[in-house]
């Protein structure tokens, strides 16, 4: 019997209230009286938390449900519904808000089995809006309640229901969208060769909102360029002073002002005419601020122990000219140590009040996803993107992190490259500093969705990135060329994909019979199209 199992195994931790609750539930439920819970199953429950709940009637943040214990889930749901009903009767008499541990904790159960997840969602989803509305939770608790159990809500319906009766800011709503069933919260796609595949990055399964307007077109899949190198890992790099090009002698120009005639008119990439497209469409980011956005360029040339990055100044010039032309404010900071780079990024995020932001990281890099300060200390690119994604000033705004650096130790000894053969274990002080920064804007523990962020790399993971000492890097030079040609007719993903095509097909190092190539890569979490012409 259930009661006997509890009494035999947990006498020291449970009081008469728990036994009475189990007894009442078993009597009123449709479950057979012969149902038992084995000692092994019952031990999966965190007894202390369950005891506290039953004794005080106050829900804690600790999980109390065991894996695959459907009976215990039903029992807990029954208690919770009764608890909520009793509490809501006291709303008018109670002046202060309910404790954040009340009700919220049930939504944050760390349940592993699909059965448990579906049961929780089925029981709680209809209850969630009323619980939030009635109990007047603060915004942070509201977000955690929805995120904790992986419950998807219709964000539009949520906004309409609660703006009139509950205090909720736009910032809070924008974070809720990240965890809602809104179809704009795309998990992204993966490109393997020329085949596109959906990938799932959120902590719960991607879900499309039901009963959507059939006339609304789904956003097109995000392109992820992943071109494999044709060279084997044992291939010796040639000795070559400067990169050469397959065609177009005019490519030797070192500025980013390119004419129509100089551009490859036979490009096979699809064009998206920004003038003809509907910029009021929900799948285009707003670009109406003046200035249109802010660009921060962190450019490191002189390092403590690594090779000097000759040519990075030309990248700075090309990028500054380009984005000033696109009506962006450009800030360039040179030769920073790793901690100073993080401080600069923090200041950049806090001062950004435009419709979009762009961060360029021009430095040496490694295969661990980091770029280096001039003190040879690493800054993790993914942590930077996470910081920007969750910053209050940047919610719902498109954010682009562009990295021009090596991503591995496959070095070309004859061509200057942005890389480091090996990374020593020097990152602890920087990680500590970074965690402190993150804790100030990300209370609690969340799995990052990196919504509205796109990261572009100059090369594929594991390979080097090439740089001309006079003209700058292949990647930045090609990117500026494509932007000057197509910034009014392409959105950002098309521009970056065309940039990748140019680098792959038009640049190479040749020494005898050996050909070295470079393939840029894109990782996108954008939820809309990013155009660089003003919204109409």
From Swiss-Prot:
Assembly, per entry: Heterodimer formed by the tight association of the large subunit p16 and the small subunit p14.
Keyword Protease part of the UniProt annotation: yes
SUPFAM superfamilies assigned: Caspase-like
UniProt name for this protein: Caspase A
SMART domains recorded: CASc (SM00115), SPK (SM00583)
PTM comment: Autocatalytic cleavage removes the propeptide and generates the two active subunits p16 and p14 in vitro. Cannot be cleaved by ced-3 in vitro.
Propeptide feature: residues: 1-273
Organism placement in taxonomy: Eukaryota, Metazoa, Ecdysozoa, Nematoda, Chromadorea
Catalytic activity: Strict requirement for an Asp residue at position P1 and has a preferred cleavage sequence of Tyr-Val-Ala-Asp-|-
Residues of the active site: 364, 406
GO MF, one example: cysteine-type endopeptidase activity
